[in-house]
A protein has these predicted regions:
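Short, Lys/Arg-enriched N-terminal segments with co-localized hydrophobic residues
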Residues: 10-13, 17-32
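N-terminal signal peptide c-region/cleavage motif recognized by signal peptidases
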Residues: 45-47
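Lumenal/extracellular ectodomains and adaptor appendage modules
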Residues: 49-351
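Residue-level detector of alpha-helix boundary/anchor positions
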Residues: 25, 40-42
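Sec-dependent signal peptide recognition
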Residues: 34-40
């Protein structure tokens, strides 16, 4: 274990960086404030939180069904609580242009979730794509699913359209544009008589079993022998809750393992002299990069926290503090083996 104490704090203050071999927990202290054969997939995945936490959706980056002629030469990933930005450089090593359909499938979101959930509508409104510095307007596709009695998922998009729901209404679990009760009433009237035949999980309250997945798509041509730059950005979907020390984060518990929370950080969070009582979580599906024919040529990860916060994540010794609030890691020939889970701890406002 290597400890790096900032020169302007004493031993009773927080360490600015704490990195262990193979895993790292980084934190700091400051002023409190609060895409024709092989599709390219920009993949996302959903993560569920405990009942007393706000659920969040862990979004991701490009996944490629291996085309031996196209390589990802570079990926720059920036993560903060306000924005996720990703920039890619793809090289077509063949003598012919290759056109792919690029997809960004979002996770499923249930129509029956409670209000304590991430800002999915905000994510939809913030999603932007550029190819070689030109804005891309993707097509939007929606699929709807129900859970069956045997625990499997049934694609019920066509059935719901027969019930009179439009694509826009099918997206409601994501966009929250329509009153849930009215959509639920429409589904109940249409589907309840068919529930047994459809083998839905329950014959009752069918309106609350529907979940929606949105998929963005666009055509992208990778010029022969050329490099294509693709960028996308969005507001991350955050979750969070309150800490009740000393019970959280429990030593060796799920939170400590998921975010590689060091003993120093755990003790700091449990110390009554400090007021780090709220936390924010986000996830990023990094392992999609492992689906490429070759490793990522050059990978850069930048994580930024707000002043006054602590941040912890699992990474190796390459993650370094480059400013009071920014941490960065650089890798060559990078093949990600696990996804990113990041947690930010914030100080309470004075009472």
């Amino acid at each position: 274990l290597t400890r790096d104490w900032s020169s302007d704090v004493c031993s009773s203050d927080l360490p600015s960086e704490n990195i262990s071999d193979g895993l790292s927990s980084v934190f700091g202290k400051g002023k409190p404030m609060k895409h024709t054969a092989f599709p390219v997939l920009l993949l996302a995945a959903v993560t569920a939180q405990a009942n007393d936490s706000t659920g969040f959706v862990g979004t991701g980056g490009i996944q490629y069904l291996k085309n031996p002629h196209i390589e990802m030469q570079r990926e720059d990933l920036y993560i903060s609580q306000r924005q996720i930005r990703v920039a890619y450089s793809f090289k077509n090593n063949s003598a012919q242009d290759i056109t792919e359909t690029v997809l960004f499938p979002l996770p499923e979101v249930s129509a029956g979730y409670d209000g304590d959930f991430a800002d999915t509508a905000g994510f939809i409104n913030s999603f932007r794509i550029w190819a070689d510095d030109k804005a891309v307007k993707p097509q939007i596709h929606v699929r709807a699913f129900f859970e069956t009695k045997d625990g499997k998922k049934a694609d019920i998009t066509a059935k719901l359209k027969q019930c009179g729901l439009t694509d826009d209404e099918l997206m409601n679990p994501w966009t929250q544009k329509y009153e849930r009760a009215k959509l639920s009433d429409k589904l109940v009237a249409c589907l309840t008589p068919q529930a047994a035949k459809l083998k839905l999980k329950t014959d009752e309250d069918v309106g609350n079993l529907w979940s929606a997945q949105i998929v963005y798509s666009w055509k992208q041509t990778f010029k022969a022998g050329k490099t294509t730059e693709i960028k996308h950005q969005y507001t991350p979907l955050l979750g969070g809750s309150f800490l009740i020390p000393p019970a959280e984060p429990e030593k060796g518990g799920p939170m400590a393992k998921t975010y590689c929370i060091s003993e120093d950080l755990r003790r700091t969070l449990a110390d009554p002299r400090h007021r780090f009582r709220t936390y924010t979580q986000l996830g990023y599906v990094l392992t999609t990069g492992a689906n490429w024919a070759k490793p990522i040529g050059k990978f850069t990860l930048t994580v930024e926290r707000e002043p006054g916060q602590l941040v912890s994540l699992c990474w190796d010794k390459s993650l370094r503090k480059i400013s009071p609030t920014v941490f960065r890691a650089e890798k060559t020939d990078f093949l990600p083996r696990k996804d990113l889970d990041i947690i930010f701890f914030a100080d309470l406002e004075p009472i």
